[in-house]
Amino acid sequence: MADLELIDCGGGRRLERFGAVVVDRPAPAADWLPGLGPSAWAKPGLEWARSTWVRGAARDPWTIRAGGLTLECRPAAGGQVGVFPEHAATWEWLGRAVAGSAERLGRPPEVLSLFGYTGGATLACAKAGARVVHVDSSKPAVAWARRNAELSGLAERPIRWIVEDARAFVRRERRRGNRYDGIVLDPPSYGHGTGAWHIETDLAPLLEDLAAISGPKPSFVLLSAHTKGFGGEYLGALVREHFGIAATGDDLVLRARSGLRLPLGGWARGPYH
C-alpha cells in the first residue's frame, strides 16, 4: 500500500504516513524504544497528544489510494484520520470473497458491513460487485463513507447507508427474516451513552443474531477487533462457534520501515476458499 506506511513505533507512539502527510499519534502497545532516531520524528504534519491535535488540526482534507479505493483523510476525534491501515490488507481478501461468492451463488452476494466507519470494507465489497448494507451509529462517519464512495467512483453501486446501532439493526433484520451471504464487522471495545456497546458482553449475542440472518452457513465472515484479549485465535473460535464454519485467525500487525512490528488487534475469517 504505497500511500500507507508505518514509519516507526515506540515509546507508546506510532509514526505513520498517509499519502504525503506524516502523522504522530499514540500506540499504547508500542512499549519499547523507537527504531529510528529523533530526527525521523521531528516534523510530523499531524500530531495527537493529550487528547487533542497539537499540530496540524486545521489541515484541509487530503486523499490517499489504498486497495484500489480513493479515501479522504482528515484530522478527527481520538487521533483518527479516517483510515485504519491495518485493515487495508483485508480488503483484497474481501474482493476475492465477493467474487467467489457471486460465482458460486450465480448472483451478486448480499453483504452486511457493521461498524462500517468510513467505508473501507464496504467499498471493497461493493467494488467487487456485492450489494452492501453499511451500518454505523455515527452519522458523520456514514457521511464520510459516502464521500469515499463518491471519490472511489462507487456512488452508484448498490449500497444502503444506515445510521443505527448495529445490535438494533441486526435484531430487526432477524425479526424480518432478511438474509445475508457475507458478514463483515469491526466492533469497537466500547461505545458511549446509555446502553452503550461493550465488546465483552455484547459481541457474542450479536454474533448469535448474525448467524441467524446468514444461515444455514454464510459465504464468508470477516471479524476484526482492536481489544486486548480479542486476538486472532479467540476471534476464530467465536466465528467457528457461532457460524459453524471453518475459520482462521491471526493478529492485526503492521511492520514499520524501521523493522519493528506493531500489534493492533486481531482478525478471523472464513470460509472463502
Outline where the language-model segments fall.
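Conserved SAM-binding motif I beta-strand of class I
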Residues: 131-136
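C-terminal catalytic and target-recognition region of SAM-dependent MTase-like enzymes
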Residues: 217-273
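Conserved SAM-binding loop of SAM-dependent methyltransferases across substrates and taxa
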Residues: 118-130
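Non-catalytic substrate-recognition/targeting regions of SAM-dependent transferases
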Residues: 2-19, 23-85, 92
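S-adenosyl-L-methionine
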Residues: 138-184
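Conserved class I S-adenosyl-L-methionine
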Residues: 106-117
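S-adenosylmethionine
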Residues: 166-242
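Conserved alpha-helix/loop element of class I SAM-dependent methyltransferases that forms part
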Residues: 85-106
